[in-house]
From Swiss-Prot:
Family matches, as InterPro entries: Chaperonin_GroES, Chaperonin_GroES_sf, Chaprnonin_Cpn10_CS, GroES-like_sf
Subcellular location: Cytoplasm
Entry protein name: Co-chaperonin GroES
PROSITE patterns reported in the protein's UniProt record: CHAPERONINS_CPN10
GO molecular function, one term: protein-folding chaperone binding
Lineage, highest ranks first: Bacteria, Pseudomonadati, Pseudomonadota, Betaproteobacteria, Burkholderiales
GO biological process terms on file: chaperone cofactor-dependent protein refolding
Pfam family, one: Cpn10
Keywords: Chaperone, Cytoplasm
Gene: groES
Top-rank lineage group of the source organism: Bacteria
GO cellular component entries: cytoplasm
Length: 96
């Protein structure tokens, strides 16, 4: 199933954090924190300004982004857990 977000929303798939520390200690799932990074899978057309014009989105499909641990609404699509959130809930784009 393909999702097309509306307005200034983006669809993000969480990128799992390392389950092992730098010293080699394995972190159990129960102690691991929710990842706060993800890959943008889909981007809406943008938010309308006061004149009714669409503002350009600052992120694009494929961008790796940072967001709050509790940001967005979780949805399950074809067995994958995805996040739907507004662009303003994103903190930054991770540059490679």
């Amino acid at each position: 199933m393909n999702l097309r977000p509306l307005h200034d929303r983006v669809i993000v798939k969480r990128v799992e954090n390392e389950t092992k520390t730098a010293s080699g200690i394995v972190i159990p799932d129960s102690a691991a924190e929710k990842p706060d990074q993800g890959e943008v899978l889909a981007v809406g057309p943008g938010k309308k300004n006061d004149k009714g014009e669409l503002g350009a989105m600052a992120v694009k499909v494929g961008d790796r982004v940072l967001f709050g641990k509790y940001s967005g609404q979780t949805v399950k699509v074809d067995g994958d857990e995805l996040l739907v959130m507004k662009e303003e809930d994103l903190f930054a784009v991770v540059e490679k």
